[in-house]
Amino acid sequence: MEMFQHILEQVKATAHTMQFYFQGEPLLNPQLPQMIALARQAGLYTIVSTNAQALSQEMAHLLIQSGLNRIIVSIDGFSQESYEAYRTGGSLQKALDGLRFLREAKRQYHSPIRIELQVLRLRTNEHEWHWIRRHYKAIGATHLVFKTAQLYDYEHGNPLMPTNERYSRYKRKADGTYVHKQHAPHHLSPCYRLWSGCVITTNGEVLPCCYDKEHLHTYGNITTQTLSQLFHSDKANTLRRHILLHPHHLPEMCNNCNH
């Protein structure tokens, strides 16, 4: 909590949004509702993304009472079989219960929170897309967002790839292998993430964006320098310059980015 308060004090005058998630599950942190409440008191828009496996009735009430603006609940299948195809060992019923708890708490406290159901487009759930479009509000969400899936093993295909390539981040080449789609030339549409925000890990490392999952491009640590110093550091500016000047030789972390 001390580190969070240290970060909040540095960003509250200039930041607009604070996202409470990266690689782990944010609801496992019992101090999360308190952290959100502090960010809201500082005037920040707050977002949490969760798989809802730890979204108990008590946690739902605490999140709503914290003033949370938006919660993303990821459910990638609507039978236990299709759900487990991507979220191995997860329980669909727990996720659906979590959505229901959020809806009930939202009504009880008359909260304007956006409850966003996020569904990855996968071959294992494509037969359910039409159903969820019709029923997402009935199961507790206020909004529905479909998202293409990031796959690490895609060069030779992947059983999770949707049948229709339109709904995939990857396209099949003439030789049968797959590449990531290029939505626009990088020199015409440069990355915006490196200029608009950053990721701060639980141990204080400052990363350029959420795609640096292996911490390969860390700017430094917020426990030894201010966030402003790190964000405008030589390391940060060198990375930005490289991405602008060498759009065809991007860092490995950029290969799976969909922006």
Question: What positions do the PLM features span?
Answer:
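Conserved alpha-helical substructure of the radical SAM core
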Residues: M1-R70, E81, A85, Q93
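Short, intrinsically disordered/low-complexity patches at protein termini
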Residues: A52-Q53, F231-S233, R241-I243, C254
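Radical SAM enzyme [4Fe-4S]-AdoMet core and its adjacent flexible, acidic
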Residues: A42-Y45, H61-T238, L245-H246
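Cysteine-cluster motifs in flexible loop/terminal segments that predominantly coordinate metals
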Residues: H249-H259
